[in-house]
Amino acid sequence: MAKVPDKPTIEGLESKWNEIWEKEGIYRFDRSKNREEIFSIDTPPPTVSGSLHVGHVFSYTHTDTIARYQRMTGAEVFYPMGWDDNGLPTERRVQNYFGVRCDPTLPYQPDFETPEDAGDEKAIKKRGEINVSRRNFVDLCHILTVEDEQAFEDLWRQLGLSVDWSMTYATIDERCQRIAQKAFLRNLERGEAYQTEAPSLWDVTFRTAVAQAELEDREQSSAYHQLKFHSSSDHGEIIIDTTRPELLPACVALVTHPDDDRYQHLLGTAAITPIFGVEVPILGHELADPEKGTGIAMVCTFGDTTDVTWWRELELPVRAVIDRSGRIVADAPEAITSQTGLEAFALMAGKTIFSAKKEIVQLLQDAEEMVGEPRPINHAVKFFEKGDRPLEIVTSRQWYIKNGGRDAELNQALIARGDEMRWHPPYMQGRYSNWIEGLNGDWLISRQRFFGVPIPLWYKVDERGEIVWDERIVPEETELPIDPSSHVPSGFDETQRNQPGGFVGEVDIMDTWATSSLTPQIACGWGEDEDLFARTYPMDMRPQGHDIIRTWLFSTAVRSHLEEAAAPWRNCALSGWILDPDRKKMSKSKGNVVTPKGLLDQYGSDAVRYWAANGRPGTDTAFDEGQMKIGRRLAIKILNASKFSLTLAGDSEADLASVSNPLDQALLSKLADLIETATAAFDDFDYARALERTEQFFWGFTDDYVELVKARAYGSQGPQEAESAHTTLVITLDALLRLFAPFLPFVTAEVWEWSHQDSIHCAPWPTKVNLTKGLPEEIDIKLLDAASETLSEVRRAKTEAKRSLKVKAEKVVVSASSERINLVNLVYNDLVEAGNIEALELVEQEGITPQVEVTLADEE
């Protein structure tokens, strides 16, 4: 007997059911299952840098619908949760929250106390930043990330993620550090990781190197400047166009296309730089664009990546003039020897790029070495995706992992790995392949920051006190994790640190992607729990945003290819962005995000999940509270329709043999088709289509079918007809609740409890075969349309006449083809009762669109 409450409500369901799910271990992973029984998910670890926004809710809901569906189909779902709590976003959050700045030169203060005004922006601004040691800074990072992670978990629970909360990790925890360091050392041993001193992209704000995958183009205002170089072979002036006149002292050559007739006579000669008087060669290179500027360009070390290519391929010297803070260095390059050149450089030294540019332009104009005025332009400039100043290129010693950027064979092998994965939607594979094909260098993984996984190496120092970079001291895997800045290598003691004949520790940390690229290994227990690893890896699903295919997805594929010679997952499910009202991506950096807590409280978690699940795979979706209102209305309707159906059906069992009425049989046949469609959609990771079709059926069920059979269900046509309606209501409601369960876990759990002892989230997914095996083979589901459309016309007539739907229809005449009339005749009694029709006349008339004429009773 169903226990239906008098006044069901959706309020408070989240706390009630989260407590029950946790207590009963509904989502606890059973690791005794075999690999073929397990569906493992490589859950994205959200960045711990403050708060989650609706974009997170959007994409994580998509993952959860798949997890819940798989669980109901009988799979044992491995669904862990991680926290990405190292890297620049976390550092910035800690820096702002506590009002501190890390100074690695300061000693550790064991008695350092957390600032009392933490989180108070006004107080921090008034007192200014406090400089702290690296270790003290890392301690503060740990304090804040623990608080943030708990807040994240609370919100995920409120949203209803069916995660096994006993299986969590943080990318900075000891286990993750050990796995990341071990993987790096194995890359190093196999020659897949290497260190080199070379030009690298550099963010002057964060003072760290940046990888190609972390770049973005931004439109910036600039200007072209025409400078006069002077031929050293009596060929007169050579005019070049540049947007970077401040790099003139770094000029090492001029280049032109070898086939450009205008400058062929200059190839092999030299030119003198204006102001600085340095002789530079004039060379040919196919990358020089005859259509750009004057067709001849200066090569500087370094203005952009093309300069790097020219420098490398033409074997040019380095004349670096920009330091790591984005200012002009103090000492002029050795090539500048003239008094005029040295005096000019002294005026630029120490200045920012902007100020140095103004200075050199003035000098050029005063010396009449510039043609005309600067010509303003807008052009794309490379930025670090988290930075706010244009990137520079500086020469530095960095660590790299091979990723196919300089190895054609590896490049093709990684593209082929994409063929081993199913992509949802399929066209996203093109983004993966295109990214790999466009790589121009290996993966730079070292960062000059503070809170991250240390690169686990030391270097020997020779007797002269020089670091011998090639003589690395490598720890044993059993010693990991280690921090070279505080740990001492075997065979040495602390007194030998930074001393001749001793050692130095590697000061760089790994890029956060270097750890996140190992999430399958971390989640599955690589090298730590081989039994778990064998049961869960390769994983079944990688859900993520389409914008980080080039970073997270690709880097994970690289690490898995190098370590396991396999693709890390079988399926890649891509979510789109959330767009603001101006159709721009929501992001913290743009300041246009909406935090989800208030939405979850206001509309309920099921309503917010409904909005999220309507976003199709890979498609950008607008933030729309209107959709949440619809979702809330749907959840309430499920409660009320379930109460009505279960109350009406009483103790009826789901016995298909009791379904004898043609309308009931047609509904169940249509339900069977829905189940087949929803199942196919979920199997293809198209949760949105499964929801759309289920919702369409549900509203037809409640608005039309229930109204049509209501009187019959109350017994107006006898016990057999009533039982047919009761059984159909029970079977349909049972299936619909299970179809809705992945999307609306709270309201479906609540209703299921009224008539079941088990959890709906462990109940079997409905199948078409179980529903149709007890039904007649030939059922015309057009009967449903004939019945509902006829009833709708009767209702419309009453509504247009501004009469109550309960008012009697004196006469209703249905004119249609014989086929249609035969269908309407099958539901004659239900139509008469549902429409309160005194006389229903059916007229056969071939070749016309069905017509319904309604005559209402006179008003009393």
Regions found by a protein language model. Give the residues of each.
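N-terminal, positively charged nucleic-acid-binding surface of large information/translation enzymes
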Residues: 1-259, 300-334, 367-411, 437-440, ...
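Active-site-adjacent bridging/hinge elements
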Residues: 35-43, 65, 120-128, 153-160, ...
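Structured ligand/cofactor/substrate-binding pocket environments in proteins
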Residues: 55-67, 83-84, 176-179, 237-363, ...
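Charged, glycine/proline-rich intrinsically disordered loops and linkers
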Residues: 99-135, 336-348, 469-497
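Short Cys/His-rich metal-coordination motifs, predominantly Zn2+-binding knuckles/fingers
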Residues: 206, 276, 387-389, 461-464, ...
